[in-house]
């Protein structure tokens, strides 16, 4: 009889940890960061409960049904060098479910389409002068020479990119992308953020220079569900449609989480939502200066229109839009990456826009977003017809992208908070990398390890929780 990797991990639980008595940890949020933290705890024999306000696990990688298959609400892929997700998938025994495929990238500039997937494409990019093309090609190589991101902390992306490639390359290629993504904050964005983008994409190419990306069979939802299943197999609990509404503090430490009328007692709590949400949760208990510190990091929201079409829009997977009059920073044709047969022959197109909450587009009703977007899409693709549309969906995320400004490293809160028993693992703490499922998994696992170690080394009489406290789990409010 063969033993599954998950079962084998459970059998090794005592070797992973020396937790001598039952402990209980509550994880707030079932995105990949929260699930990874819960998995790290559960496989060490720690009792864990995950609270998720949505009706499914996955967080920003949440999904909906298209043609009988789950599709991400917001576009997702992995790079070939995303080792943390690969390690997790191997532990779950589902590495054969990762699909690696070549993709292509393009740019829409001055009402024309250009390929930008290979070095040859760069040399044929006519919006730049011959010297500008050479500078653009060398820019990525020069950027990769930077080994220590700290030397870039004092620079904005504009300053650094102009130094590397000149003003022409910045004006044509980089400025429209920064403005399209960060809007009024484009001039504040750190060079570190852009350096990591170049480093990451440069490391996900084959020997010929073509970009390779990865996807999970059945979508990211399938991986999130498999991870949730593994947590349950190790004794963990995941409660969907359950919003954390507050924290309980006793004896100078966090001892539980409120979920409506219920309270879950806990030896430790890991909070994974966006920092403004965490700030609201802890405000009754935390020092005012710490709450203010959490609120220092600003976020952009995201509106994502997903179109189901009866035919392909173009042959490009990732189309950067370097046209300031176009409201979306990119047109991502998902089915040029994952084939349309996966979705009953439907072609999937994402139109994504990061924006402040005060923006008109954020306030539009869903039908208005569709009408507004189609006008611009038809300008870009004159042959496009509304008759191609088989379905449309508008998804919104209030806290989608932290604004990574200069000296961002000094703004990031530590995993351990001033409130004993409360730990943080959020997308805003992913740095110098940008947020994404690979790094959410990395940070979640690291936090789970920290919490497990605290529970292992501290005794009940040290203040974690006395013997007179309630048993782990649900107690009366």
How would you label these PLM feature ranges?
Residues 3-4, 331-477:
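Conserved flavin/dinucleotide-binding core of flavoenzymes
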Residues 1-25, 43-44, 466-468, 472-476:
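Extreme N-terminal leader/targeting segments of oxidoreductases
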Residues 44, 242-349, 354-363, 367, ...:
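Mid-domain catalytic core of redox enzymes
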Residues 33, 56, 276:
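Conserved Rossmann-like nucleotide-cofactor binding loop
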Residues 67-150:
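Dinucleotide-binding Rossmann-like beta1-alpha1 core, especially the glycine-rich loop
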Residues 23-50:
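N-terminal Rossmann-like FAD-binding beta1-loop-alpha1 element of flavoenzymes
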